[in-house]
A protein has these predicted regions:
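Conserved beta-strand positions that form and line the central face of beta-propeller blades
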Residues: 6, 22, 78
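Hydrophobic side chains within well-formed alpha-helices
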Residues: 3, 31-34, 61, 111
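Short gly/ser-rich anion-binding loops that grip negatively charged ligand groups
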Residues: 5, 24-28, 36-40, 55-59, ...
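A mature extracytoplasmic/lumenal domain signature
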Residues: 11-13, 25-27, 52-54, 83
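Acidic helix-start/capping segments at beta-turn-to-alpha-helix junctions
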Residues: 6-19, 121
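Active-site SXXK
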Residues: 1-8, 97
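A conserved catalytic-loop motif detector
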Residues: 42-126
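Conserved catalytic neighborhood of penicillin-recognizing serine enzymes
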Residues: 16-48
Length: 126
């Protein structure tokens, strides 16, 4: 996947609650724009769309998340969704988040480009 690949909004993603950018069904963002929306705005709608792009479905992506958590030694984590909104059985610890964060920053240092943004625009300046 490249930063210029497209992430398309599904019906499910467009109906997400919580923090969002009002991603409309069939609207597309580049991966670059999607990462910005996820990291800066905590956009749950875009998070679901990205999960669907990577995993084929959010459910499969969550399985991938849990498999990776086990591989990393995150012993007190169980993901139930991709966006982090409270759900029965969805939990983690500060220690496990630290393990995940170390892996993310070590293997994908470009993420710091997004997580250090305080305020920015998407969709041609909006």
């Amino acid at each position: 996947m490249t930063y210029q690949d497209k992430v398309k909004c599904s019906t499910k993603a467009s109906k997400m609650g919580g923090s969002q950018i009002w991603f409309k069904e069939n609207e597309e963002l580049t991966v670059d724009e999607a990462l910005k929306a996820i990291c800066v705005v905590s956009a749950n709608d875009v998070t679901v769309a990205m999960a669907e792009k990577i995993g084929g479905s959010e459910e499969n992506f969550v399985k991938m998340m849990n498999d990776k958590a086990k591989e990393l030694g995150m012993e007190n984590t169980c993901f139930k969704n991709s966006h982090g909104i409270d759900e029965e059985g969805h939990y983690t610890t500060a220690k496990d988040i630290a393990i995940m964060s170390r892996e993310l920053i070590t293997k994908h240092p470009d993420i710091l480009k997004y997580t250090s943004i305080w305020q920015d625009t998407l969709r041609n300046g909006t």
